[in-house]
Amino acid sequence: MKDLLKKKIIDFAASIKIEKCSIAHYSGKSAVVCLFPYFSGYREGNLSLYAHSLDYHKIISEKLKLISDFIKSIAPSCTAECFCDIGPEVDRLLAYRAGLGFYGKNGMLINSEYGSFFFIGYVLCDLNLTPDAPIENECMGCGKCFEACPGGALSASGFDISKCASHISQKKGTLTKEEEEILKKSGLIFGCDACQKVCPHNKEACKAMKEFTENLMSGICLDDIKSLTNRQFSEKYGNRAFSWRGKKLLERNLELLS
């Protein structure tokens, strides 16, 4: 029965264009873990690739809601909750347990088809579904990500988040001189793609889902936002992932990079 239910769920996910969907167990529950590829090509700009499309949280949540509704339709007494970014489990760990990828030296999860250019979402339900097993693939270990990191946050000994350009770009308040230099070196006002761009596993990464190839915006300039009130900023950019840390932070970063 649990294999049949699993097949129905995986087949349904495929029907709504989610091609990578597997099962992991978490605290006595089954997690239906899904990957959402977003790589739509490289283009000039000052925003990380993942922030080019409309806000992925909304897109993914809508897809996951369809899966949770489907689960409830085939198992009416079942509970099913959707999570994207914020949830009771580390999404990369769940995806690893579900056999959807392996860890790179940069800490990213790598899928054989998508590389590391994907978002992760999952549905926790109290069905007893057969879990998938982690895969045995390994990172090539070339060390290119170590060399490319603007802040030197990556090394054989681990990851230092305080030197990560992506973390710094989203850190509110006044930055230290060292943090400012790292941000300038990255060239981006929100996020960072340096370690992913040089990763050999991303060389043949599959293209994005349709939703992540539309309404693309690769950058903004200070003149775009400086005269806007916070409310106007929210109305204009509230449907973008880069807007969630607010206008003031983006202004600071834009001024630093000008």
Regions found by a protein language model. Give the residues of each.
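Immediate flanking context of iron-sulfur cluster ligation sites
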Residues: 131-140, 180-192
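Iron-sulfur cluster-binding cysteine motifs and their immediate structural context
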Residues: 144-169, 185-213
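Gly/Gly-Pro-rich "capping" loops immediately C-terminal to redox-active cysteine motifs
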Residues: 208-228
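Long, compositionally biased charged/polar accessory segments in the mid-to-C-terminal portions
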Residues: 243-258
